[in-house]
């Protein structure tokens, strides 16, 4: 059985109609070279972009479908091999590390105390005098 047929059969097992529809459409896009742009997937499924994004997330998290995407390659696809898997996984790890660093900075950032905010700032004259 080829991978497209495998995922087509897996999509038929999904009970939610919208999720099943997106899964069936994705079964035609196995391998990075067969990536589908989000806009094309939205048009094909007749759903909104936010809804399709959420469904793709559901396919990954709830149904454990290996759907890939990464910077430098437009579109989404079902990961077909270990090279694609690790490329996507490493990019996700990099993004995770960036988010973690940003979170730490925000957690530790100095916030002006209420007293600092309540201080009256003298208004400068019209010509800086």
Predicted regions and their residues:
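A short acidic, leucine-rich amphipathic alpha-helix
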Residues: 37-44
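Short, amphipathic alpha-helical interaction segments positioned at domain boundaries
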Residues: 83-106
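Exposed, interaction-prone assembly regions rather than primary DNA-binding/catalytic cores
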Residues: 106-129
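Short helix-capping/hinge SLiMs at alpha-helix to coil transitions
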Residues: 27-33
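Minor-groove-contacting beta-hairpin "wing" of winged helix-turn-helix DNA-binding domains
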Residues: 69-80
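Short alpha-helical segments that sit at the start of domains
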Residues: 1-24
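Short amphipathic alpha-helical interaction segments
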Residues: 47-58
